[in-house]
Amino acid sequence: MSQFTHINASGEANMVDVSAKAETVREARAEAFVHMAPETLQLIVSGQHHKGDVFATARIAGIQAAKKTWDLIPLCHPLLLSKVEVQLEAIEAENKVRIESVCKLAGKTGVEMEALTAASVAALTIYDMCKAVQKDMVIGPVRLLEKTGGKSGHFKVEA
């Protein structure tokens, strides 16, 4: 197993020095799910939710969150993202919403945390907008699906 890159020889957490790393194109995809009652999902899908367009709000929240990842997670670097995409899909047969995020840049460090943050915050936004209707929604799983670029190469979750 690899060593933790954020821990120094004394066991202290530090931000990784990426100054000597080569810039490469890096991309990451993540997903999150929000499980809910059929009635709650129907309110979202039909556009009848009293707070407005849940998917549009969650999409914007996810994009905003990706851009703020460095501000939320202490050891993440501030990144100049070139792409953030958040897609939401109602899976009515399973009473859930699937969120997929994609983040991309040309840089010295990966965008996995940005993709995970985008998907997570989009899921939290759905919960926030729907909690008046249903409080027992479940968020999860949240996971990295794929990452490309950088020294560690290509990672993809097996289907």
UniProtKB/Swiss-Prot annotation:
Binding sites annotated in the UniProt record for substrate: L75, C76, H77, M113, E114
Kindly give the Pfam families that the UniProt entry links to this protein.
MoaC (PF01967)
Keywords (A to Z) from UniProt:
Lyase, Molybdenum cofactor biosynthesis
Q: Which residues form the active site?
A: D128
E.C. code: 4.6.1.17
**InterPro entries, per this entry?**
MoaC, MoaC_bact/euk, MoaC_sf, MoCo_biosynth_MoaA/MoaC, Mopterin_CF_biosynth-C_dom
SUPFAM superfamilies, A to Z: Molybdenum cofactor biosynthesis protein C, MoaC
Q: Which GO terms describe its biological process?
A: Mo-molybdopterin cofactor biosynthetic process
Q: Name one GO molecular function term.
A: GTP 3',8'-cyclase activity
Q: Lyase among the record's keywords?
A: yes
So, what pathway does this thing act in?
Cofactor biosynthesis; molybdopterin biosynthesis
- Protein family (similarity comment): Belongs to the MoaC family.
Q: How does it assemble?
A: Homohexamer; trimer of dimers.
The record's annotation in PANTHER family points to: MOLYBDENUM COFACTOR BIOSYNTHESIS PROTEIN 1, MOLYBDOPTERIN COFACTOR SYNTHESIS PROTEIN A
The protein here is known as: Cyclic pyranopterin monophosphate synthase
Query: From which lineage does this chain's organism come?
Result: Bacteria, Pseudomonadati, Pseudomonadota, Gammaproteobacteria, Vibrionales
User: What gene name is listed for this protein?
Assistant: moaC
